[in-house]
């Protein structure tokens, strides 16, 4: 009887330990209403396509949606985590197709995007790297790929706070 209690206690302890390991391994939640607090380096005319200065992010285990709230134009991007997603926009009267791959790994979300303008020439145009600081600040590293490699890429770091 005593041996059975010991086995049950050990089994219960193992379940509790396993549950705490799984809980601590949960991916971060980027969901919320976000407001831009800083941008580095400052670049005249720079405007993050999906975020702008204010955005709403909704997230499930398998999807992520970014809704640009401000400044206009309102834009929405929908991603399926671990798969390719396509979003279409009209920019300056021209159709723009953005094919993205969103991957959540450890505490980082990576979104790599190919852009296809009206001329049909698709290229890797952008890589976003998201993470959360311990204080809850959303850090977005935005790497813009210049054309088809004929000039240097530009990396901009954006910081957002929850509204």
Tell me the role of every PLM-derived stretch.
Residues 1-12:
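Bacterial N-terminal signal peptides that target proteins for export
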Residues 18-20:
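N-terminal signal peptide c-region/cleavage motif recognized by signal peptidases
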Residues 25-163:
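Hydrophobic small-molecule pocket/channel-lining residues, especially in calycin-type beta-barrels
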């Amino acid at each position: 009887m005593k041996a059975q209690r010991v086995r049950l206690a050990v089994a219960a302890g193992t379940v509790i330990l396993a549950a705490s390991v799984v809980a601590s391994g949960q991916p971060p939640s980027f969901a919320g209403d976000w407001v831009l607090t800083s941008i580095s380096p400052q670049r005249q005319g720079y405007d993050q396509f999906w975020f702008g200065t204010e955005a709403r992010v909704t997230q499930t285990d398998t999807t992520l949606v970014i809704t640009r709230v401000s400044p206009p134009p309102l834009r929405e991007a929908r991603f399926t985590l671990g798969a390719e997603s396509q979003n279409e926009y009209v920019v300056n009267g021209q159709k723009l197709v953005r094919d993205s791959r969103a991957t959540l790994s450890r505490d980082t979300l990576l979104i790599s995007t190919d852009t296809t303008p009206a001329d049909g020439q698709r290229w890797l145009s952008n890589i976003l790297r998201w993470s959360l600081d311990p204080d809850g600040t959303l850090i977005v590293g935005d790497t813009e790929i210049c054309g088809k490699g004929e000039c240097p890429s530009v990396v901009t770091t954006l910081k957002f706070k929850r509204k």
